[in-house]
Amino acid sequence: MARIGVENSLTDVQQALQQQGHEVVSLNSENDAHGCDCCVVTGQDSNMMGIADTSIKGSVIKAHGLTTDEICQQVENRT
């Protein structure tokens, strides 16, 4: 399964992705995003920790306005 970086405030998303078998990494700083296939951020600050500008190999999913299931589906589609 994929390695997914998730902001700390999105605990429900972290748990759901872990249940699906993904390796979940807490995003505390920009460096935590390196090596992730995909990152999930709140989207409330579009450049949280500089992740929007960093060159990770995966995509960045903004969780704002999405349900946990919708976020998990986007992760599946992008990894």
Curated annotation (Swiss-Prot):
| Signal peptide location | none
| The protein's name in its UniProt record | UPF0180 protein BcerKBAB4_1316
Domain of life, per UniProt, equals Bacteria
**Which species is this UniProt entry from?**
Bacillus mycoides (strain KBAB4)
InterPro entries reported in the protein's UniProt record? UPF0180
Family in the record: Belongs to the UPF0180 family.
Q: Which HAMAP family match?
A: UPF0180 (MF_00506)
